[in-house]
């Protein structure tokens, strides 16, 4: 999920105010704007991490930056100024302020200097200001959207303008030699967002005032876990002891990333690598003879969410090593070069694992003009792979981490491209399996021309971590290999409160998709019908809402809340969400 605590988003506004000079604070105009900024920031902060950063914070900061953009300051001065402001706000502890700023400010400043964006446009890019707030702020998302739509493809055939040479995929060896199910029916396990914390301490304080707790102090952190914290490694072991009982049923496993904990202010490259290495070892030990299809999460990066080549080559080198037991040489070669790959699951069925750090709004490197259009970019590879699959009579299952929903803090440029690809190859793509939000969601893709014809389905699975009030969960998809279609899925959860009391972690079936929504099949058309019924059928919507967070905290959802969540289903880009929501 979005990893950076709200203080960093507030500091984006503050950074815009001082990125070039701490001297702005001593001017009369700058001081007045700063006073307003402090007040707006405090108002934003007191509502907690799940509330969007106030547009005022960002706009005032942008105004200050634009007034003093010609002045220069060192990174040391910028970080010190921001640290002083952060610590003075008392909304984060000093070590969190300094840790986050030291990690992220050099990247943000470097990107601002290299990019062509004005500070006001950044407020729109980060979705801090809506389209109704500032035409300049909202223009940046539309600019990314339009550039992808107009320049990446030749309409209406969606061919890549300058297609590089890619490997012939027609002779790949399948990963699954023999399926375990009866007749044509098999089962796929998806796990995501484990976020285990090796420093979790039983009996520690879950309300420590930092972005991640249960690591020190005295409090109610239970032996199995706590809803405000990431799970201990001992709980990971319990989870996989349970999953091991499913081995005889599973044909393959989809592992959609986010392995390290949420201590984003004090992480290191070595810690990020160790988290992935540890989980890879656990998975391989638990399922020694079951194929595993991994994808890269935003938390695997260091700092979290930040990815650009060649700076991030260490990350690709590490997953190349840890994913090696499951992927063939061609797939691993592409992993080491780009962080994505394709493999043949069985004749006629292919997987594409995407590197969705390119779809991460909090990856500041995505502001650079080359991220969408560089040589051998991911969108070109994606289209080429789908074209080959289409020619070879194959169906494709897409897996990734960050989905295209407003909840996931995705980028409109990427999602505009992706939406077109899904529409163009709707006869090839049979489903999309993602994670990241920690919520149990789904989104329906439709044709970009009219948004009336369903074209694809994205299934977003809940997390295994309990962080931010979730019961740990995993999902099993029922798959018909004769038609290469997902025909049902089963969502499982464990109750952490009960587990802490009994010492046993028991997973129970929460629901079956077909039974819960009374569906004949899981086609995009059927899911569109379900989503539209939620607009008027409160019973159906309440079933969806209850399973969204799988939280012990039961919240009410009024009409505005209901509309928001339904628009998340249809809003692949922020402009589509806003249109649905009536913004």
Swiss-Prot record:
Signal sequence residues: 1-21
Enzyme class name: hydrolase
Organism listed in the record: Dictyostelium discoideum (Social amoeba)
Disulfide bonds: 55-129, 58-123, 86-97, 214-229, 567-580
GO molecular function: hydrolase activity, acting on glycosyl bonds; metal ion binding; sphingomyelin phosphodiesterase activity
Family: Belongs to the acid sphingomyelinase family.
Cofactor(s) this protein cannot do without: Zn(2+)
Entry-listed glycosylation sites: 72, 182, 377, 495, 500, 537, 547
Protein name (record): Sphingomyelin phosphodiesterase A
UniProt cross-references to Pfam families, sorted A to Z: ASMase_C, Metallophos, SapB_1
Cofactor binding notes: Binds 2 Zn(2+) per subunit.
Free-text function comment from the UniProt entry: Converts sphingomyelin to ceramide.
Any one GO BP annotation for this protein: sphingomyelin catabolic process
Database matches in Gene3D superfamilies: 3.60.21.10, Saposin-like
Sorted UniProt keywords: Disulfide bond, Glycoprotein, Glycosidase, Hydrolase, Metal-binding, Secreted, Signal, Zinc
């Amino acid at each position: 999920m979005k990893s950076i605590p709200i203080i960093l988003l507030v500091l984006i506004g503050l950074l815009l105010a001082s990125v070039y000079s701490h001297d702005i604070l001593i001017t009369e105009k700058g001081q007045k704007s700063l006073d307003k900024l402090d007040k707006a920031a405090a108002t934003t902060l007191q509502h907690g991490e799940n509330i969007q950063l106030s547009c005022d914070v960002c706009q005032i900061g942008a105004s200050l930056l634009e007034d003093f953009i010609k002045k220069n300051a060192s990174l040391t001065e910028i970080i010190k100024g921001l640290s002083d402001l952060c610590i003075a706000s008392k909304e984060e502890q000093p070590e969190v302020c300094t840790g986050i700023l030291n990690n992220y400010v050099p990247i943000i400043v470097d990107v601002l200097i290299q990019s062509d964006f004005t500070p006001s446009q950044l407020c729109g890019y980060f979705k801090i200001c809506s389209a109704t707030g500032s035409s300049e702020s909202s223009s940046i998302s539309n600019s990314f959207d339009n550039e992808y739509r107009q320049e990446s493809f030749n309409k209406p055939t969606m061919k890549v303008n300058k297609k590089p040479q890619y490997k012939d995929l027609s002779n790949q060896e399948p990963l699954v030699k023999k399926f375990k199910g009866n007749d044509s029916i098999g089962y796929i396990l998806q796990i995501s967002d484990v976020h285990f914390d090796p420093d979790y301490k039983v009996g520690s304080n879950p309300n420590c005032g930092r972005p991640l707790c249960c690591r020190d102090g005295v409090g109610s952190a239970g032996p199995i876990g706590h809803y405000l914290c990431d799970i201990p490694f001992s709980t990971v072991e319990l989870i996989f002891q349970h999953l091991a009982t499913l081995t005889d049923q599973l044909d393959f496993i989809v592992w959609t990333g986010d392995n390290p904990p949420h201590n984003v202010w004090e992480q290191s490259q070595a810690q990020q690598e160790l988290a992935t290495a540890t989980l890879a070892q656990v998975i391989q030990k638990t399922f020694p003879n079951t194929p595993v299809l991994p994808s890269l999460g935003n938390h695997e990066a260091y700092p979290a969410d930040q990815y650009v080549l060649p700076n991030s080559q260490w990350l690709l080198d590490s997953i190349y090593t840890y994913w090696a037991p499951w992927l063939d040489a061609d797939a691993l070669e592409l992993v080491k070069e780009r962080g994505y790959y394709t493999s043949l699951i069985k004749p006629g069925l292919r997987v594409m694992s995407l590197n969705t750090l390119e779809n991460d709004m909090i990856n500041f490197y995505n502001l650079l003009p080359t991220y969408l259009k560089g040589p051998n970019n991911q969108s070109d590879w994606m289209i080429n792979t789908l074209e080959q699959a289409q020619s070879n009579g194959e169906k494709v299952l897409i897996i990734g981490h960050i989905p295209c929903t407003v909840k996931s803090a995705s980028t409109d440029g990427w999602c505009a491209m992706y939406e077109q690809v899904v529409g163009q190859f709707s006869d090839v793509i049979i489903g999309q399996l993602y994670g990241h939000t920690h919520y149990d969601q789904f989104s329906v893709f439709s044709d970009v021309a009219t948004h009336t014809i369903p074209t694809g389905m994205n299934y977003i699975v809940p997390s295994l971590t309990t962080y931010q009030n979730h019961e740990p969960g995993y999902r099993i998809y029922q798959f018909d290999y004769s038609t290469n279609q997902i025909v049902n899925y089963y969502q499982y959860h464990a109750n952490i409160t009960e587990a802490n009391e009994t010492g046993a972690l028991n997973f129970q079936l929460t629901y079956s998709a077909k039974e819960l929504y009374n569906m004949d099949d899981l086609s995009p058309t059927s899911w569109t019908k379900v989503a539209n019924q939620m607009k008027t059928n409160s019973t159906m919507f309440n079933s969806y809402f209850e399973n969204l967070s799988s939280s012990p905290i039961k919240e009410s959802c009024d009409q505005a809340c209901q509309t928001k969540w339904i628009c998340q289903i249809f809003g692949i880009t922020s402009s589509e969400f806003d249109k649905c929501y009536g913004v």
